[in-house]
Regions:
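Conserved NTP-donor binding/palm subdomain of two-metal-ion nucleotidyltransferases/polymerases, i.e.
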Residues: 1-20, 26-202
């Protein structure tokens, strides 16, 4: 499960985060095709107009939209970035945890991979699809929660490898200044040996 109900668990009141659809990541092509077939057997249909390559939109008779993701985002213009994201997306299948959400155990990414999916989702919307405040709110409540240091380090290693630390740092600085993000929780991402951050802006 990506975003949605999983991300809502970080909000002080889960219902504050409106979920427009259900996002499920299945990067393996055979499993992806099987998932589509299973959903169709249960009356879920593929929507007539598809707006993206990285997911297939389906809906049931009640109008609930399910997005089956074969990737975290559309392809970017940099092939090296795409290859790294694809690598980490495939690794997500073995970096899962069970979250109890409203009494149900749901498979969600481990913290580092959840953070990565949120970061890539923001980057996708920033570059391709329009950027909304909801993305920043998700990012703030996620990082205002307590997380394991080793998972934080894993996340930072991944975004460094992909080459998007600059984007993530810019988002963090905006969120600290305007949206109440806890600076101490993300300072490891906004200052390193290559970057001097003027803390007066906070």
């Amino acid at each position: 499960l990506l975003k949605g109900a999983g991300t809502a668990t970080y909000y002080p009141v889960k219902s504050l985060r409106k979920s427009g659809d259900i996002d499920i990541l299945i990067p393996d092509k055979l499993q992806f095709d099987k998932a589509v077939s299973v959903l169709e057997l249960h009356g879920v249909v593929i929507m007539g107009e598809q707006h993206a390559w990285h997911h297939v939109e389906m809906h049931n008779e009640n109008g609930v939209i399910i997005e089956l993701h074969r990737a975290l985002a559309e392809q970017f213009d940099d092939d090296d970035v795409n290859k790294k994201i694809e690598q980490y997306t495939e690794e997500m299948s073995v970096h899962n945890i069970l979250k109890n959400i409203d009494g149900m155990n749901i498979v969600c990414p481990e913290m580092a991979w959840e953070a990565l999916s949120l970061a890539i989702h923001m980057l996708h919307h920033f570059v391709r699809a329009g950027f909304g405040l909801k993305l920043l709110c998700d990012w703030v409540v996620f990082w205002n929660s307590e997380h394991d240091e080793s998972q934080k380090n894993t996340f930072y290693s991944m975004i460094s490898s992909i080459g998007i630390t600059g984007f993530v740092k810019a988002v963090n600085i905006i969120c600290i200044k305007y949206l109440g993000m806890k600076k101490e929780n993300v300072f490891f991402m906004i200052q390193d040996e290559k970057t001097e951050v003027n803390t007066d802006i906070f």
